[in-house]
Amino acid sequence: MGPESQTVYADDLGQAVHSAHLAWQFDPLSTSDVSGQVATRTIGPVRVSWLDLMTGPSGWRGRRTFSDIRSVPEPYLIFCMPICNSIYLTSESGNFDIAEFTCGIWDSTQLLEFELKAGRYEQI
């Protein structure tokens, strides 16, 4: 059985990303220009997700708030590895530019912000 995959556009993007990467609040202006595919597969206690997105000229931004964190009380470790472009993460412990083929790790109990540059972004 293959992973669940869906093509997403601005209006459906939040739900697709929430199912793959927990709850986030997205910048409405930059979200309106984002489209792509999200695929998720659960293997036992592990959820593997793939994103292939095209952002608009201003990139794409979002953040996890206290409300988002409380919506899923069980803590998770999240591994992200960009394979096209990079992701910039900001947390209470610092700022991190996760480059292509570099693994970033964060836990779901952290306040976190992300920013993608304009263009294509792909991650597993």
Sequence positions of predicted segments:
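N-terminal functional module of multi-domain proteins
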Residues: G2-E122
